[in-house]
Amino acid sequence: MDKDRVELLIKSVIRTDGYLNYANTKSTILLTLASGVLATASLNLSKLLPLSLDKLSTSSFVSFSFFLVIGVLINILSVVRTLKAISPYLKNSDKENIFSFVDIVHYNSSSDTYSEKIKKLDYSHLGEQLTSLNYNLSVGLLDKYKNQRRAIILLKISMASFFLSIVVPWFFYCFDISLTEKGPIVIMLLFIISLVVFIVFLLTLIIYLLYLGKDKK
């Protein structure tokens, strides 16, 4: 491989390594955001309800608890995905290269073995080594970005669930089912609306799970 191509590969490796550092920084921000949303929701959502928890109607309390629990669980999944994105990529390359610290340990039993390989390496094979390194770094980078994308989607779903945990109880409260003269009609209307919201929420989760399965393939 000629000198120009080797220099191009070196620049590409530096660029990929820079993206890896940026991905880790982005993951830290996502983790902070997800943790902040979870803490805020756990401590303050009940304060936004029309009544205290012990005075809420059964329907309001159940809807609040349901969406709150769903939101917390999905938020935790988002945190788990973010932690996976932060985790160091320690998979060795399919083809050994002398630059990756993972490959150095994986393919060499001692420093002497590694030293001998360095001595035998000539410039003509340097490009192959850099290509192997850049490919392995790119695989790790893509894996981090995929986990970040999934974490963001899960975080959005959890925030939507937290929002519904406030909106639905207020909805029940405003209609005041227990006092209205058209109780059966309102109950039926609320049941239909709640069912639609639940179906939309469930479909969102199913689509996301299908997306994960397709992504893994």
From Swiss-Prot:
The keyword Membrane applies. GO terms for cellular component: plasma membrane. The chain crosses the membrane at residues 29-49, 60-80, 152-172, 187-207. The keyword Iron does not apply. GO terms for molecular function: nucleotide binding. Its main location: membrane. It is a multi-pass membrane protein. It is found in: Cell inner membrane. Keywords: Antiviral defense, Cell inner membrane, Cell membrane, Membrane, Nucleotide-binding, Transmembrane, Transmembrane helix. One of its GO terms (biological process) is defense response to virus. Pycsar (pyrimidine cyclase system for antiphage resistance) provides immunity against bacteriophage. The pyrimidine cyclase (PycC) synthesizes cyclic nucleotides in response to infection; these serve as specific second messenger signals. The signals activate the adjacent effector, leading to bacterial cell death and abortive phage infection. A clade E Pycsar system. This is Pycsar effector protein Ec303145PycTM.
